[in-house]
Amino acid sequence: MLLYTPPKAAENIPVIDLSESPDRAAKAIHRACRETGFFYVSNHGLPAELIAAQFETARTFFNLSLDAKMALHMKQAPSNAGYEPIGLQKLDSQDKKTTIAPVDLKESFYCMVDLRVDHPMSQRRIRAYGHNQWPQDLPAMRDQTLRYQAAVRGLGDRILALLARSLDLAPDWFEPYYQMPVSTVRMIRYPPQPENAEFNQIGAGAHTDWGGVTLLAQDDVGGLEVRNADGDWLVAKPMPGTFVINLGDLMAR
């Protein structure tokens, strides 16, 4: 039985070692989710080589010409798969009635749940599922990204089991709701801040993620900040060998 107590503000983002006992990890996750909704996981089991290869794949893709990337624009796909250029997203929702927030300074490539064109979910044109777009000049990108997607999906299943334990539920409690999840790999590039950037224009504005759980691999540049229960911003510095985990709106509700 879990008794409710008001959350208190975290002073840092905890690192949770997944090699520890499930009960101990679940207890740490419970506290982290109440205080920030964010935590790192270490000893997660994904090979460092696989993660490094995915970062290299992303760098290679974003170094393609703009014409080559625009040929894979996500708007031309039946799903949300493909390239999203700079200027299409504006995440900061603060006071939109009186303030026009600048667009985010980032470009992205989305890999959705890869289904055949004749799959029923593709036929229903649900944009979270469908045939992915891949650049012809990077033949290895598809297999590498799908391997990474499968590995991270497995880690996500482990996180869901620990979240269930943290709520005194059976470890498989979430499984019926995640038989076919929206398992998206999103590669993001944040270019250097241009000299003509608008006031308060940054890579990604303040926001919450809409899904269940986000698993984020960071490079060594940094920039991510997390707001705690008191409204203070904490720096989520890059930590080699970890993923940053955060609860999305779906799980928080």
Walk through the language-model features, giving the residues of each.
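Peripheral, non-catalytic segments flanking oxidoreductase cores
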Residues: 1-253
